[in-house]
Structure formats: C-alpha cells, structure tokens
Curated annotation (Swiss-Prot):
Subcellular location: Nucleus speckle; Cytoplasm; Nucleus
Organism: Neomonachus schauinslandi (Hawaiian monk seal)
Signal sequence segment: none
A Gene Ontology biological process term: sex differentiation
Name this polypeptide is given: Sex-determining region Y protein
Family assignment from sequence similarity: Belongs to the SRY family.
Cited SMART domains: HMG
Protein's gene: SRY
Amino acid sequence: MFGVLNSSDHRAAVQQRNIPAFGRTSFELWTDNPTSNYRCETGGNGRDSGQNRVRRPMNAFMVWSRDQRRRVALENPQMKNSEISKQLGYQWKMLTEAEKWPFFEEAQRLQAMHREKYPDYKYRPRPKALPQKSDKLLPAASSSMLCRQVLVDEKWYPFTYRDSCSRAAHPRMEDQLSSSQPVNIANSLLQQEHHYCSTSLRDSPETLAMHLSADPPFYPK
C-alpha cells in the first residue's frame, strides 16, 4: 500500500512538471522566474538604483503645476501628457510675479529641507539614449539622379546623369561642347551618358576606381 501511494505521488509530480507553459497563468510563470523576481526587487533593471535614487527638489513651476496638472487631466481625460505640459507652461508664463511668489517660497522651503536631508546630493542628469545605427544600406534616393541643363546655341537642353557615371562622361562632354555642331551635341551627350552608365556597371573594380578618381564634374557656363 505504501509503495502504491509513492508511485501515484511520483506520477502526479511528473505531470505537474510537464504542464505546458500556456496552461499556466502568467503570474505563476513570473513567480517561477528568478530573473523576474530579481528585477522586481531591484527596480526593473537588475540594479537598486531605482529605490536609492534621490529625486531633485521641486522648483516653483513644479510646485504650481502639481495640482494644476491633476485638474487639467481630470477635465480633459483625452488630452495627452505633452499637450498638458504645453498648456501648463503657457499658463505659468501668463501669471504675474505676485502670483508666482508663493510658489517660489514653497520651492525654497523644499530645497532647504532637501539639503538638510541629503547634504552630499549632486544633480546627475541621466545620459540621453543614442539612436542605434542600422547596418543595412538604404536604397539610393531619387536625389542621387541629378538633372542639369546644357546651353547649346542659346538653347537649354535637359541633361540627366548619375554621380557614378558622370565623372567618366564629363571629359568627353567638354570636348563635345567645344565643337561646331550645336544641334547634334545634346543628342550625342545623352547617348554617351547612357552608354557610360550602362557599361560602368560591368566594369572591374579597378576601372570604377579610375572613374571615381577622374576630374571633377564639368558645368558649362
């Protein structure tokens, strides 16, 4: 009889351990996680800085807005906290010096109490979180394609080029502009620019490096 009870207890214990996680409540899972308990006791980040951190004494505006913020939030529950702060800041600026003076006195009293309680206190602002840089390359924007106009025989012709192929095309463009055929220059320039753009993609890395190190773009006057 004693052996049967032990085996049944053993099976119950095994079944209890094999209960899937989705069959248990989130509170049970949270209490079984020692990391969660540690975060709860230390303030959320595994450190006790949340409980031991000394807050700054309130200034005059904070003393005044403490009750005003609560009142505005109750009157306008749909208003966001940022909008409430803007409204309170505007109302504070509209107050006269006589109306602000009682709050300055209260702030001075709170600061004196704070100095007595924390004589070694020094304000240390929290470092601002830096945005994480993405390692992924963004696609080329439409601004990488530049549009220029070429003046030929007192007429402006649109000329579109990309930075990757314009450096190789500009030396020959300069020679073309100095010739005496103004009518066909624009068409020949566009054809050469299309040819250099299409062939530069098939060039070797050495050839591309030579193109990039060529003379700067030529801009006709």
